[in-house]
A protein has these predicted regions:
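Soluble catalytic domains of membrane acyltransferases
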Residues: 58-167
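Membrane-anchoring hydrophobic helices of lipid-metabolizing enzymes
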Residues: 1-81, 86-90, 99, 115-121
Length: 167
């Protein structure tokens, strides 16, 4: 069968875990990178995102036009984290490769490929200590002034294809 059942005890359970769930970035990690390599990686990732999102995953986006009128303004998007891989790529197809950022748990930087090649160029790591938390808040403030589009998955855990609200 293609389907399997996932059991949980509370809506805060982490039902999908990475091998490096306790991965921690150094305190001196540079969050915002405005470099030619940054733009190249983002551009290439965006092309892959279109192919993967629409060609492989067959995603259909309803209401895309509502976002396009705000493309030159900064905004936050709150969404359910429902797909292990495509939640990283699909926003690139919706918000553009230049201005898209995502607030993410540091464990994601420990994931092979995505954590090493994509997150360093658009991920905003949630701080694990006060110094890192302040750094994140400053980065968000800077990006807000730059009209960035910031995605937040507030439940902080992947629940495959779950569409309900978890508090």
């Amino acid at each position: 069968s293609k389907h399997h059942t996932i059991y949980y005890n509370s809506t805060t359970d982490d039902v999908v875990k990475s091998k490096k769930q306790d991965f921690t970035l150094p305190d001196d990690y540079q969050i915002i990178k405005h470099t030619p390599l940054n733009y190249l990686i983002r551009f290439l990732a965006s092309g892959f995102a279109y192919l993967f999102t629409y060609g492989v995953m067959h995603v259909k986006v309803i209401g895309r036009d509502k976002l396009s009128k705000y493309k030159d303004e900064g905004y936050f998007v709150y969404g359910n984290h429902t797909q292990m891989v495509n939640d990283v790529f699909m926003p690139l197809t919706l918000f553009g490769w230049k201005n898209y950022y995502a607030i993410a748990n540091q464990a994601n930087w420990g994931i092979p490929v995505i954590g090493k090649t994509l997150l360093p160029y658009g991920g905003l790591p949630v701080g694990k200590n006060i110094k890192q938390a302040i750094k994140l808040l400053k980065a968000v403030k800077t990006l807000t002034k730059e009209n960035a589009h910031i995605v937040i998955y507030p439940e902080a855990h992947v629940w495959p294809y779950y569409t309900g609200i978890r508090l």
